């Protein structure tokens, strides 16, 4: 009976809040509060890309059309005693792909006072939460990258794919925790974070991560299992890249880091009645977890041929957003330098950087934007231009449409003698976002 009553109260609060235009349903008493928030996205993608093979479809059986969904639901429970706020954020795993953002993901405990806020166990670091990118002012979802294939057979050389970056989030959401090996239920590594209160427009934050492979979405704490030689990997779950090169040799690169420090500083200032400026600088530093290993299976035995040292993780991002009346513009630049690379494998280049910008105009419920993104990873480049529009039917309900044209050019980093190859295409998206 108690469970039924609680469910009825939550449902009533959610319905009332959505109808009244509130984005966050709240259930509160004198010193306790339960805040509910959720998100659902449905999207149709249409892709027209050249240089794809006969069986390189967008979905299993459709070459140019696919649907995509994303969802999240979280409850933040807080209790206030003597001006000290203690609480926990609990995120539920949805039946569709989880929304991977700081607002809708990452269960953790937090304590907040007038001196600042401490987060224990959050998968998102200060560099992620305080960062600013140019794309933040854009309309739509910016999800064109879900519908392209920059590692097709045409782009490969000796069966090795080229490395590309198609989104600025690669640099900001902790470089060491954003790999293809993650399944849809995985979360980034656990962190301890501290954020100062906002003072005269300034806010700072810092996070510590002991081991980026210590994720929260996997069954075991130890997500990378090695055999007796500590280089032959018998179980791979997080951040490991194994590349087959000449003579059937394997180069294994563990892209995890230890003792990672992430930090950020933001500044917000009202320049006038209709003008605002936001600035941000964020960065991350970490030590490589292990050496890169060159190996080969000889007579059914895993044999280590050589080991290589990887460079430290050193990444930063600079961003700014300026708003004047109905106009907004944003720009950002991010760099990884030579982070987690070695000249013995990354022969074609070792540096990675990106920059992007966007301008948007909003009038009433309608918002339209134009954005540009360019990245270079090991001298492999991606250029993308996107036009998007969205219409707020009611608070929390936002249909959108966007069209992106992209071009990717490059080659596998291990083979500098390989020819540069290019693929390009156009992606159209139509979708709806629902937030409460």
Curated annotation (Swiss-Prot):
Molecular function terms, GO-annotated: porin activity
Pfam families for the chain: Porin_4
Protein name: Uncharacterized protein RBE_1298
CC terms in the record's Gene Ontology section: membrane
Cysteine pairs bridged by disulfides in the record: none
UniProt-listed InterPro entries: Gram_neg_porin_domain, Porin_dom_sf
Phosphoprotein is among the record's keywords: no
Signal peptide residue numbers: 1-19
Keyword annotations: Signal
Signal listed as a keyword: yes
């Amino acid at each position: 009976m108690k469970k039924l009553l609680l469910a009825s109260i939550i449902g009533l609060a959610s319905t009332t809040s959505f109808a009244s235009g509130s984005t966050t349903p709240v259930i509160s008493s004198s010193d306790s509060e339960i805040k509910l928030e959720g998100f659902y996205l449905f999207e149709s993608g249409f892709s027209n890309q050249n240089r794809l093979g006969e069986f390189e479809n967008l979905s299993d059986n459709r070459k140019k059309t696919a649907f995509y969904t994303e969802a999240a639901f979280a409850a933040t429970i807080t209790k206030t005693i003597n001006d000290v706020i203690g609480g926990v954020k609990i995120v539920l795993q949805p039946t569709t792909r989880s929304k991977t953002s700081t607002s809708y993901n990452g269960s953790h405990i937090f304590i907040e006072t007038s001196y600042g806020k401490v987060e224990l166990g959050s998968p998102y670091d200060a560099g992620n939460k305080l960062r600013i990118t140019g794309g933040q002012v854009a309309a739509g979802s910016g999800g064109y990258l879900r519908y392209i294939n920059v590692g097709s057979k045409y782009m490969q050389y000796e069966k090795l794919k080229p490395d590309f970056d198609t989104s600025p989030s690669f640099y900001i959401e902790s470089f060491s925790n954003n790999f293809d090996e993650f399944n849809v239920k995985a979360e980034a590594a656990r962190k301890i974070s501290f954020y100062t209160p906002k003072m005269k427009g300034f806010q700072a934050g810092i996070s510590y991560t002991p081991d980026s492979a210590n994720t929260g979405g996997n069954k075991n704490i130890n997500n990378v299992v090695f055999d007796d030689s500590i280089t032959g990997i018998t179980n791979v779950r997080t951040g490991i890249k194994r590349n087959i090169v000449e003579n059937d040799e394997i180069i294994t690169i563990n892209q995890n880091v230890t003792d990672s420090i992430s930090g950020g500083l933001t500044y917000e200032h009202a320049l006038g009645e209709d003008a605002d400026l936001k600035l941000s600088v964020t960065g991350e530093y970490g030590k490589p977890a292990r050496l890169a290993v060159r190996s080969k299976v000889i007579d059914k035995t895993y044999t280590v041929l050589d080991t290589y040292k990887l460079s430290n993780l050193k990444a930063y991002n600079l961003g700014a957003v300026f708003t004047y009346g109905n106009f907004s513009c944003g720009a950002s630049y991010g760099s990884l330098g030579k982070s987690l690379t070695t000249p013995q494998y990354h022969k074609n280049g070792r540096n990675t950087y990106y920059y992007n910008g966007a301008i948007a105009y909003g009038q009433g419920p309608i918002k339209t934007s134009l954005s540009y993104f360019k990245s270079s990873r090991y001298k492999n480049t991606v250029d993308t231009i996107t036009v998007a529009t969205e219409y707020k039917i009611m608070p929390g309900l936002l249909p959108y449409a966007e069209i992106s044209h992209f071009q990717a050019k490059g080659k596998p980093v291990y083979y500098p003698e390989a020819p540069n190859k290019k693929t390009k295409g156009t992606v159209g998206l139509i979708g709806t976002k629902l937030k409460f």
